[in-house]
Each structure stands twice: as structure tokens, then as C-alpha cells.
Amino acid sequence: MLVLEELDECLPGRNHVEEEVEGKLLTEAINRFLEGIPEHSRNVFVRRYWYLSPVKEIAQEYGMGQSHVKMLLMRTRQQLKQYLEKEGML
């Protein structure tokens, strides 16, 4: 990004700035995606990938089998990938 090159003299490492901007944009896109999916799917996804909860623990908390949790996570990841591709993030 040419605009970020203007910050080269006052910030350490331009790549760091670009990574920060890209990370922020990606975070915003993921948040939009999560807002658009069912609450149950969102909760399971956040527990697994934000709080790093084991599948077994998530299954117990939500009264689901571990295979059901794994399937739900796989489908949500697929939906997220499609969403990020549509948004031009991938």
C-alpha cells in the first residue's frame, strides 16, 4: 500500500504496519461473518478458536456429541472461507 510507505520513517518496519492493517481488516471481516451466523454456531466457533477449548469440553457444555461439534466447526470454517473469498480477503 503506497499510503503506508509514508509512515516508513516514523514506524518500525513497513511490513509490520501492513500486517497490522491486514490483521485489523481480517478481524473486522471475521466479526461480520460471526454476526451473520446462528448464535449456537457462533458460540461453538468462538469457544474453539478464541478460547481454545477442547472439542470434548465444548461437546459437554452444549450437550452434543464430539462428532457433532467437529462437523459444526468444519461447516463453519467452510462458510468462513467462502465469506472471506467473497470479501476479497483470500
Give the predicted meaning of each segment.
Residues 1-23:
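Internal acidic/polar
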Residues 30, 41, 55-56, 60-86:
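DNA-recognition helix of helix-turn-helix
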